């Protein structure tokens, strides 16, 4: 009899735990179904709520209802970018919303700065190292006041920045609703070629050579040498392209973040981003964000080495080495990024 009562008590506790988990997930489901179909906001939606601390509230007000003349042109530009994202999501709802609901694990790319109530979705190969440096300075999660004093490897240490997936579901919902959210994007094929050059043509990236290079050589290179199979250090762009468009690649695991699509990393059809910056106008857009949060006088976004960056001409050279079929397949893979962020189809593509 006692054993039966104990068993019933255990079952009751388990049921309560399951119910609590389901309720939390249901709350997250509600938030995302509400946010997925909300109209594009043209005015600051938070001005009357008194929800935000000084930095973020002023940032949102200036973004949606600029009072300073220098912000007026930027406000029009960023409204057009928001509209482009929303229009693409509506027009391609079947493909852009394959995932109807997000979970906390989908939010690991969203970096949170509590002091300024900012959320930044980082996209590798779009100045994300410098943005992580800036976010470390803004959030005070480090000993530095100058972003360029932060070693690049330290900027990528997970514990140096807090990401949205570390919060409870109610706290996630609160921040997604009330914080200024932004991301930076880049011409998709320039970003792809930049990732290839960085991860497969530099000797020091042995971890990528071992994890991905050996797999690519084994699958797509005929008569590969023993050395190539063991090191994976000499992957050709054609082999990399073949790996990306192979249906089996995405079935086995999500793409690596360095060549994953922006819409899969940041979920712009599920999360309303207030500001979309572009790599092509990086310094202007980045410093605009810093001005919005009241840090424009004390902090400037680091400039980058233009001599080593991947250009359109460089991307054209790499794409000239792959077939028109592979070019078409790659375009289909990154098509939503092209459409959402208003990038033209590259003139060098030979689409079938």
Swiss-Prot record:
**Binding locations of 3'-phosphoadenylyl sulfate:** 124-130, 186-194
Membrane topology per record: Single-pass type II membrane protein
Q: Which Pfam families match?
A: Sulfotransfer_2
Where is this chain glycosylated? Answer: 205, 223, 321, 342
Q: Which UniProt keywords apply?
A: Carbohydrate metabolism, Glycoprotein, Golgi apparatus, Membrane, Signal-anchor, Transferase, Transmembrane, Transmembrane helix
Instruction: Offer one example of a GO biological process linked to this entry.
Output: motor neuron axon guidance
Which coarse location class applies to the principal site listed for this UniProt protein?
A: Golgi
Catalysed reaction, written as an equation: chondroitin beta-D-glucuronate + n 3'-phosphoadenylyl sulfate = chondroitin 4'-sulfate + n adenosine 3',5'-bisphosphate + n H(+)
Lumenal-facing ranges: 38-352
Q: Does the keyword Chaperone apply?
A: no
Residue ranges that the UniProt entry lists as topological domain Cytoplasmic: 1-16
Molecular functions per Gene Ontology: chondroitin 4-sulfotransferase activity; sulfotransferase activity
Q: State its Enzyme Commission number(s).
A: 2.8.2.5
Determine the domain of life of the protein's source.
Eukaryota
| Gene Ontology CC: one annotated term | Golgi membrane
* Protein localization: Golgi apparatus membrane
Q: Which PANTHER family match?
A: CARBOHYDRATE SULFOTRANSFERASE, CARBOHYDRATE SULFOTRANSFERASE 11
Q: Give the family this protein belongs to, as stated in its UniProt record.
A: Belongs to the sulfotransferase 2 family.
Please report the name of this protein according to its UniProt entry.
Carbohydrate sulfotransferase 11
**Upper lineage ranks?**
Eukaryota, Metazoa, Chordata, Craniata, Vertebrata
